[in-house]
């Protein structure tokens, strides 16, 4: 099997394109992803535990669902253009959304961290998607057409919120690596889930379940030998040192 170095040499002979900085970066990210995948390989999460922590969605027509609906209706009534604009900033499940928490453009500055988190999140994604499919809760704007979301509509199930899972898990994993930025990372993690309610894409109970599931999944990952081995990777440690070098006074204010 060719190594990253041999692949780069072969590709350079085949095309002038790879001589560009963009191509070199793409190749570097591919190689780092290949490095990160073995670290997360064979990681098994306790699916039953995660399902129990997520719990069940409120039954249709129940008082709990009525409370969910009342919150969504109230938020829609007082939704401002500023709130809508802010929710769009955390639309994508991409590591860059945490850049403001650490004061560095994460996607460019930390390819090893990005690749590693992506690999470790795969079993988390698999777990919540299975629960979502099993529960089959329809989105609030489908059940109640008077609700008009301010972010793009989605056709997947509503419970639990996948965004809440991702933001919660990612915030916990980053906080384990960068405890100095824990509070700021957790703030972004909470806001990423809350935005799904603010814009009417999820019931509050969807997001609460996703946050519980995501936090516990992260704890399981952090306790695993795979994560501990990943933490010791020299490439990752070098990236974390760069992030720690950003002084606290240089960190941007967090959106409120």
Residue ranges and their predicted role:
Residues 16-34:
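N-terminal export signals
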Residues 13-15, 28, 162, 205:
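Residue-level micro-sites within transmembrane alpha helices that shape
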Residues 36-198, 220, 231, 238, ...:
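Hydrophobic alpha-helical bundle signature of multipass membrane enzymes
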Residues 191-222:
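Interfacial helix-loop-helix junctions of multi-pass membrane proteins
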Residues 1, 12-18:
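N-terminal export leaders
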């Amino acid at each position: 099997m060719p190594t990253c170095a041999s692949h780069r040499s072969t590709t350079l002979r085949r095309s002038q394109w790879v001589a560009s900085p963009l191509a070199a970066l793409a190749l570097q990210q591919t190689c780092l992803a290949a490095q990160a995948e073995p670290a997360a390989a064979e990681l098994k999460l306790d699916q039953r535990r995660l399902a129990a922590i997520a719990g069940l969605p409120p039954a249709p027509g129940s008082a709990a669902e009525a409370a969910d609906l009342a919150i969504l209706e109230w938020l829609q009534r007082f939704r401002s253009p500023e709130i809508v604009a802010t929710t769009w900033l955390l639309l994508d499940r991409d590591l860059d959304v945490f850049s403001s928490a650490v004061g560095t453009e994460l996607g460019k500055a930390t390819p090893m961290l990005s690749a590693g988190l992506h690999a470790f999140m795969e079993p988390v994604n698999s777990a919540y998607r299975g629960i979502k499919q099993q529960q089959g809760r329809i989105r609030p704007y489908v059940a109640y057409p008077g609700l008009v979301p301010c972010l793009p509509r989605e056709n997947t199930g509503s419970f639990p919120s996948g965004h809440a899972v991702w933001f919660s898990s990612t915030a916990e994993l980053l906080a384990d690596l960068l405890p100095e930025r824990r509070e700021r990372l957790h703030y972004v993690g909470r806001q990423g889930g809350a935005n799904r309610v603010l814009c009417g894409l999820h019931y509050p109970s969807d997001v609460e379940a996703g946050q519980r599931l995501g936090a516990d999944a992260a704890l399981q990952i952090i306790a695993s030998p795979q994560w501990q081995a990943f933490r010791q990777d020299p490439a990752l440690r070098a990236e974390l040192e760069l992030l720690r070098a950003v002084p606290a006074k240089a960190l941007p204010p967090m959106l409120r």
